[in-house]
Amino acid sequence: MKSFFNNKAQTLINLEIKKGKIPKLIKINFNDYFKNKKKFLNKISVLFRNKKIIIRSSFSNEDTNRSSNAGKYESYLNIKYNDVNEIDLKIKRLSRLKNQIRGENFFVQEMVKDVSFSGVVLTRNLENYTKCININFFDGKNTEAVTSGKTETKSILFFENDRFKIPKKFLNIYLCVKEIIQFTNEPDLDIEFAVNKKGLVSILQVRKIVIPKKYKKINLDYKNLFLN
């Protein structure tokens, strides 16, 4: 069976969810861009009119079924939609992060506005690979705080059970994660998200957690645990 996970951009393009949203994006081939910059810069300015954008890698060795290379490549945030010089500069810089860009892609995506908190949710505890809902988050506008390792980040660890519910703050994220699991038919996920002040969840990235073939399994004798 073919994996749902191809590369960062295509995974988001293929994903269909109702419990959250995928910020508008366009995937562009590096070779196509450098052959006709004017065409693509104009396309970006029209598609993201009056918006701020983020330029992100979508290389073939990222977010596949076998490896993630999470955090290996830089993203460029808060660029004005019509600042063609800055957009071109960042695309050039991104292209230099890989030795060979033939057949490789990047994507441009709308920045999420009015962010209340953001972070990463895992469906496994990466220390022992126990199944759970592990949410690492940052209260504030910085959507890269968790992935960049800022010390102000917080975490909760929730084990699904019949007695206790996940805190209301994280309910929409939880529902969105369950929907993505069902859509992708993949229970082991690493998902980047941002939640705005109205509680709307934006999904920024979805990758498969690569589970080692051998790891020490732990049998839990408790049903609910929160770590703050």
Spans of model-derived segments:
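Conserved N-terminal catalytic/coupling substructures associated with nucleotide/phosphate chemistry
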Residues: 37
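Basic, glycine-rich
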Residues: 40-42
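Flexible beta->alpha loop and helix N-cap segments adjacent to enzyme active/binding sites
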Residues: 68-90
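Catalytic core of tubulin tyrosine ligase-like
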Residues: 95
